[in-house]
Swiss-Prot record:
It is found in: Cytoplasm. Tetramer of two alpha and two beta subunits. This is Phenylalanine--tRNA ligase alpha subunit. It comes from the Bacteria. The keyword Protein biosynthesis applies. Its EC number is 6.1.1.20.
Amino acid sequence: MLEQLQTLKSEAETQINEAADLKTLNDLRVKYLGKKGPMTEIMKQMGKLSAEERPKMGSLANEVRTALTEAISSKQEILETAAINEKLKSETIDVTLPGTAPSIGTKHLLTQVIEEMEDMFIGMGYEIAEGPEVELDYYNFEALNLPKDHPARDMQDSFYITENTLLRTQTSPVQARTMEKHDFSKGPIKVICPGKVYRRDNDDATHSHQFTQIEGLVVGENITFADLKGTLTVLAKTMFGEEREIRLRPSFFPFTEPSVEMDISCFKCGGKGCRVCKGTGWIEILGSGMVHPNVLEMSGIDSTRYSGFAFGLGPERVAMLKYAVDDIRHLYTNDLRFTKQFQSTETGEI
């Protein structure tokens, strides 16, 4: 039986290798491995062997069957590939093959950063408020404690459309509109205001005539500076790491009093001083402060009863710092070599 198995294996492998088409190969499968084939006959004869020979010959027979099965599968794959190639040569289009999948975009880096901040604030009970990008001069300046003759207006050149309308230079007008219509019987104001803003800046590595801002506003009874500091601490740790510390420096903004700028401990050097933090150990992130009483009163809010805080930051700056982007223009030029480095996995691949 040993010689019979060896002869069968050699003969079958030779014929399998020489098979020129799938029909011939299938005939060989039936011939050698079918119910009436030699392998089946050999397996039936196992019962006639002695108890000592049966395990050895049974194992050998199984090895031969496995070898022939694998040889047939391998040859089948070769013949199928050859058949497809031959068919492709004779047809302009093979409609049975899968088509080329379209490229699917992912969320832009800025969108990812904005949504990360939105998710954080929504988790803290904030709502998202929006307003027009073509804004009235009143809401962009006067309602924010910047009357027409205020010297602080020179701090930001604006794109005026008419004498009283312009492209908003900040998302703060959304805060003014929100305060005007808010009903405090339904609770305090807790909103963030993301959106595009426009300023007459010359485009360079750190400036753009159009960019995005996210501003936050909380107004209610007994809102204190401690509430502002706690909120900014959560923001810094969420966006830049739990180990971040914050530093608040006195500053000036017409719509807040007192006003502060927030720095975070450098995430690159841990506060030791490096190129990113310019050797100081700290990186400036945003401006903030307690809402000026004049701003509250202009919105019809009793400043003796209600207080609040506001803050504002640029997602571009957050993205540039967090992901080591050295030129703001990379965020807007739509160069796939750049954007592919920050692919989101939510919607597929670029």
